[in-house]
Amino acid sequence: MKTRLEQGLSALHLSPPPSGTLERYCSLLLEQNQMMNLTAITDPDQVVDLHMLDSAALLAVDDFSGKKVIDVGTGAGFPGMVLKVLEPTIELTLLDSLGKRVNWLSELSAQLGAAPVECIHGRAEEQALLEGYRDCYDLAVSRAVADLRILAELCLPFVKVGGRFLAMKSDNCQEEVERAGRAIAKLGGQLRPMAQYQIPGTEITRRVVVVEKIRPTPKGYPRRFSRMKKAPL
């Protein structure tokens, strides 16, 4: 695991964190996964490739140094916690709707020496309406499996004007991106050229949809999630 991580990070032009922090993250994830559902991926090498290195690749897409970042629908902490471990100057918020996961993430950040990390149990469509969260972040990131029109409505309200929303997607997302153009514009965003990368040591190619926030998201967004699903923008 250690060699695979080091080689993968080197291929991404990143230095491994001290004290084997990411290896410890892998081990703690797999240990906790026996007690609660954190990931369907249980092979250690695949955890390295599909969680750790996939998340780390985002550091080549944008400058995260010293930035205020929110990871929406973080799950087991991907990509946010990996980004924080590799770039400790990030001011990180992890948001997830499952309380048990959020409690574990809070413990994990301390175990990895990544604290302080703000871990919030909540729904994005409600959290984005609150003062101190709306229009406050330099970067919103998400690896959540959801249509980009819905992800944009959930994530863009968190981003301040001049900031960016980064959505991690599969390589065949072009149609989805084109379909989301109208929604992104309505929410105050503007599509920028997508980034593309290959996960080191694999044949898997991924894309990152880059959206710049050029004006405030109008009042009334995000809507209730049921409404988003029923009538995407």
Per-range role (PLM):
Residues 1-38:
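N-terminal auxiliary segments of SAM/dcSAM-dependent transferases
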Residues 9, 33, 108-109, 181-184:
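Conserved hydrophobic residues forming the short capping helix/wall of the S-adenosyl-L-methionine
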Residues 31, 35, 47-65:
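Conserved alpha-helix/loop element of class I SAM-dependent methyltransferases that forms part
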Residues 56-152:
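Conserved SAM/SAH cofactor-binding pocket of Class I
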Residues 87, 159-161:
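Helix-to-beta-strand junctions that scaffold the AdoMet/dcAdoMet cofactor pocket
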Residues 101-103, 173, 177:
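Short alpha-helix immediately C-terminal to the canonical SAM-binding loop
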Residues 162-172:
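Conserved beta-strand signature within the Rossmann-like core of class I S-adenosyl-L-methionine
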Residues 178-233:
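SAM/dcSAM-binding transferase cores
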